[in-house]
Design a protein with these regions (language model features):
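Intrinsically disordered, low-complexity linkers and terminal regions
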Residues: 1-173
Length: 173
């Protein structure tokens, strides 16, 4: 288990020319620095409703860029890919978004697609650098769109999973 970085040490992390994250390429102190930037975004979402409104979108984008860690199982992969699809192609309707975990609850037959090597050019560092809540929301949406574009070869699968969510996710327990 990795050691968490303190909030004060996160403030000192900025995208630099050293220590690229092996998953997304962010230059912010390697994988630990990248995670620290993301963890700070999560903390900020608790204090600002505008940031909180796009937090799930940020989680899905980050998870898909760090699929080896956050999308190990077919269910976790499906949750994040379908979540991104829901947000970007189905308006991010809360009732649909929260139907995804209900759809994945229990025995669901899924085959995990191959993890992509190219997962987008924007990273958590681009969002972290946003000045103010409005810029943050805009950057999260751009980041998610960039990751979605990188997953173009799996978009039809995500849409099929969304159709399954819509067809059967609401009544499942």
């Amino acid at each position: 288990m990795r050691e968490p970085l303190s909030r004060s040490s996160v403030r000192g992390i900025a995208p630099t020319g050293v220590g690229a994250c092996p998953a997304c390429g962010t230059r912010a102190g390697g994988r630990a620095g990248c995670q620290a930037l993301f963890d700070e975004l999560g903390a900020l979402a608790w204090s600002d409703s505008r940031r909180a409104a796009v937090h799930n979108l940020a989680v899905d984008a980050y998870a898909l860029q760090h699929a080896e860690e956050y999308c190990r199982s077919a269910k976790s992969y499906a949750a994040h890919l379908t979540g991104l699809c829901c947000a970007l192609e189905f308006g991010g309707q809360p009732n649909l978004y929260w139907a995804i975990p209900r759809w994945l609850n229990g025995m669901v037959q899924l085959q995990k697609p191959a993890v992509l090597s190219a997962r987008g050019t924007m990273t958590v560092a681009d969002v972290h650098a946003a000045a103010g809540s409005d810029a943050y929301v805009e950057r999260v949406r751009a980041w998610a769109g960039d990751v979605w574009k990188a997953y173009a070869t799996q978009q039809e699968l995500a849409r099929a999973w969304m159709r399954a969510v819509i067809a059967g996710g609401r009544g499942r327990r």
